[in-house]
Amino acid sequence: MSRGLSSPARWSLWLVSLALLCAAAATRLHLHTVVDTDILAMLPPQQESAAVGAAIEQSRQAFVDEVLILVSGDDETVARRAAVAAADVAATAGLEPDDSGRSMDRLLAVYQKHRYALLDDAAAARLAQGGAPALATDVATSLASPAGMVDAFGSDPGGHLSHFLTDLPQPYPGFLPDGAFFSAQKDGKYWFLIRDRVSAAAFAEGGAQGTRAVTEARAAVAKVCVRCDFAATGAPLFADAARHAAQTESIWLSLASSLLIMVLIAYVFRSFAPHVLAGAQLLASVLAATAAVILVFGSIQVITLVFGTTLIGIAIDYAFLYFAEYWFGDGAPEQVMAAVRPGLYMGLATGVVAFAFLLLAGFPALTQFAVFSVAGLVEAGLMVVLIFPVSLREFPQVPLHPAVLWPQRFIQAACRRSRWRLVLPLAALLLCIPGWLMLHPSDDVRGLQNLPPQMLATDAHIRETLGQVPPPGFFLSQAPDLQQALRQEEVLFDRVAAGAPGYTSLGLSRFLPSDARQQASLAAWRQVFADRQALRAAFVHFGLPKELADRSLAEWQAADHASLTADEVSAAAPDLKTFSISAGAGATLLSTVTGRSDVDSATLAGYAAATPGMSFVDPLGRIAATFQRLRERATWLVILGYLLISALLVWRYGRREALRMLYPPLLALGLTLGVLGWLGEPLNIFVVVALILILGLGRDYAVFLREGGATRRSPALAVTLSALTMLFSFGLLAVSSIPALHVFGIATLVGILASYLSAPLSLPPTERA
């Protein structure tokens, strides 16, 4: 149908179709969210309660915003001045200081007011059972120790309030609240911890803000104290370092691959036209693919741009097929389209079918990949059909040269009947068997990150100094009301303390005992102070003055006997609100357990399972499980897609030839997996995407050669140029320092080489001349 269209009609049809697609996408466009950088949004929605979702987001936000600055020195006064300078500069740079230290001072006043409601279960039971003699015993024991002689509040002779305060969880063991800091004296040095949060809304902006603030704070400390040590860590700092490394790497990799491809095209075709047409095809394909995704989803994920553009790399095969036939084929320019049409249409059909199957994945990531790739491939094919014939009309004036001839010679030599056509692939597959056995899946997102070793060492040093390792997850206590939720959390913490005394529990119940526990505490004190004479006698029995008994009784009578409430605690320490999750009816509390070393998730999950109303959530584990399902589903969909492609090939070429054409891409797939296993590389979703690319290229090579035959040089040249450009584009990623791109690059490097070298196996063997 397109053969009879005039040149203006072809240009109009192509431009109008592209413009209509872009205009339709513009109606769905949100200017502030054109490119979405939240990778987690690419994961499918979890089948979870609103409380779990809110808790995951709240804990994630607390982690990604925190910046820790640690200043230390031999002289306390100078080190403190340096820490003050660092805190001031960080605040000026936009970081928000943490208020935990000052919150503790306000909490102390609240606890003093409600001190009679703060006994733990064991102390309350002992006083309730022992009465006045039990209190006298506590007072005598307390006063017998040097620390007990110091009555900080003038109303705690038995040390019961002091015991409660001492038992409060310390975020950083050995570090105590000290105004705006947490401070400690250890290893002959004075340490000051500054806790800040980035204030920028966007994650990337927060990383830049945190890095800038830390740099300025480091300089401020150096001015005040040359001999003081400075260290900082936090997710924003790691994110900014990773972003800078990725930007630098992407620039030089892009420049290197672009330069190599331009030199290759210029050397082979000796013309500027291929650069213009191939570049226009790529731009139009990316534009159409992006518009299609925005039209369907309203925005496009940055990871879709990266990997979708990678998959559209297959589309340049269509351009090379046309260029090779036009410049070095046997027919006139007007006959080029007729010569390449069968291979072009068959390659386009099989490619669209393969990627369209990903639409059935049910995963936002794969669905976007599919829409992007299908739209891009269709646009690339449309441009070849409509624009290339009217842009390349004159006979090319480029003579044949060795770079044009050797691909055909290689294909012809590889197609000659020989036992090596059977022996070499079998030998390669036998060598791959140990590699297949060594393959191991890895869906942990931490293994995909490029974290600078120096920053990791600094982070480990800070965590070791603070005696705190970030928890692997968190607990949720869900109940109809707050009091039941607090009680469930108390039961869990008691179980953890009994089974793992080295762990530190951190939750609202550690700062706000449940009302049941508080009422038991108040009842115990009522029992103690029920009989004035018995109280006096008990004190005198231990050699204590009866006036001390009278004072204790008077303080009890004058004290507030009401329970401590959540509102009072939250007003004194607003940070404690992070332990409460607002999601629907009832009450939900978030809590964690930390230790000086890594805490085992399975152990914590076991404690939660043994406590009614409690659950343990491992966010990283959930993400890893989602990536695993994503990888497995993508693999099965690719298999189903290839079964359908097999049917198309059987319909076009017959069963025998279809099997012959499927052999090279499947052989390349097996070789790629074998090499990955030998190298110890993990099998993850990025490897699956690379395998999709490899299968697509291998399929195109087989179709192009089958339609062109071994006796024509243009199909062989097109396949060779495609392989070389793919190696330049994606094989270079093998040297990337980013693990995800590194394994993707290795897979594509091996797979493309294997696809090209095995492509002649798609043709029937020929007899030697």
Each predicted region: which residue ranges?
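Transmembrane alpha-helices and their membrane-interface boundaries in multi-pass membrane transporters
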Residues: 295, 305, 311-327, 341, ...
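Extracytoplasmic
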Residues: 103-267, 271-272, 508-650
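Solvent-exposed, non-transmembrane loop/terminal regulatory segments of multi-pass membrane proteins
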Residues: 27-74, 172-181, 321, 419-422, ...
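Pore- and gate-forming transmembrane helices of large, multi-pass membrane proteins
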Residues: 329-361, 708-737
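Signature of alpha-helical transmembrane segments and their immediate interfacial
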Residues: 1-37, 389-445, 760
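Juxtamembrane segments of multi-pass membrane proteins
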Residues: 420-541
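Hydrophobic transmembrane alpha-helices and their membrane-interface caps
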Residues: 275-321, 658-702, 731
